[in-house]
């Protein structure tokens, strides 16, 4: 197997948090009650501080999809991608991913955000693999507002990556030893400790301290340059 290049999404390749931005997007368009603004901001702050639990963080954002199917949410997701997400994707992020693609690495996006919300962003970057939090559905295919399976956050990111490697028949230890993982967040410390080459990207204060103490590389992306042109040019 080629080397793994693992990438977090929110505040790493994306400037901002996709699920926090999703709630703001829906509230601005009257699709969610604006009373959720305080809860949204509180979870965002506590996530960055590393004090929000995976369950409360992931379940809150899963609740925003409750009662509708993927097909019903699709137009909203497309508008969100166009209006909010794409302008927040720095050209430097595409260049970083392209560097690993050209090196022949296996590109994996691993994120605490829900698969449904972020799969368009993964496609935008040309990721072949996506590990994300899964949304539960009922018998009719509508989202229940709950999550399903292991949450892809903190220790769950390590568990889900182990499962993904096992499904592919790949030995876990050598794959992780050769892997690079990019993240901004202290919440990703378990996976950063598990790989051979952790890289802190515009790290939050707690991760910056860890990176300094452990002499990990620190990367500062040029976030002033968005990628509003033809993103296909970044996938070659």
Task: Please state what every model-predicted region is.
Residues 1-52:
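Active-site neighborhood of HAD-like aspartate-dependent phosphohydrolases
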Residues 2-4, 75, 82-236:
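C-terminal cap/substrate-recognition subdomain and adjoining C-terminal extension
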Residues 17, 68, 156:
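Conserved active-site and cofactor/substrate-binding residues in soluble primary-metabolism enzymes
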Residues 19-22, 58, 140-146:
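Acidic/polar active-site rim loop that often engages polyanionic ligands
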Residues 21-22, 42-43, 56-60, 76-80:
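A general alpha-helix detector
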Residues 22, 60-61, 117, 160:
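Hydrophobic alpha-helical segments typical of transmembrane helices
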Residues 36-40, 57, 175:
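N-terminal alpha-helical segment
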Residues 44-70, 134-139:
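Short, compositionally biased "basic patch" segments
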């Amino acid at each position: 197997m080629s080397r793994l290049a693992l990438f977090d999404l929110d505040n790493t390749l994306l400037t901002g948090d996709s699920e926090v931005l999703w709630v703001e997007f829906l509230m601005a368009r009257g699709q969610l009650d604006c009373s959720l603004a305080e809860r949204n901001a509180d979870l965002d702050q506590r996530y960055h501080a590393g004090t929000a639990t995976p369950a409360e963080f992931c379940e809150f954002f899963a609740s925003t999809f409750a009662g509708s199917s993927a097909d019903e949410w699709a137009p909203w997701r497309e508008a969100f991608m166009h209006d909010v997400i794409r302008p927040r994707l720095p050209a430097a992020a595409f260049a970083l991913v392209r560097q690993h693609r050209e090196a022949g690495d296996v590109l994996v996006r691993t994120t605490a955000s829900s698969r449904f919300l972020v799969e368009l962003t993964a496609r935008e970057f040309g990721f072949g693999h996506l590990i994300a939090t899964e949304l539960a559905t009922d018998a009719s295919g509508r989202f229940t507002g709950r999550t399903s399976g292991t949450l892809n956050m903190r220790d769950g990111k390590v568990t889900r990556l182990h499962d993904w490697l096992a499904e592919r028949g790949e030995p876990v230890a050598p794959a992780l030893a050769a892997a690079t993982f990019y993240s901004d967040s202290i919440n990703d410390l378990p996976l950063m400790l598990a790989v051979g080459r952790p890289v802190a990207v515009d790290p939050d204060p707690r991760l910056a301290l860890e990176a300094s103490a452990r002499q990990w590389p620190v990367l500062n992306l040029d976030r002033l340059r968005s990628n509003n042109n033809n993103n296909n040019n970044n996938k070659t």
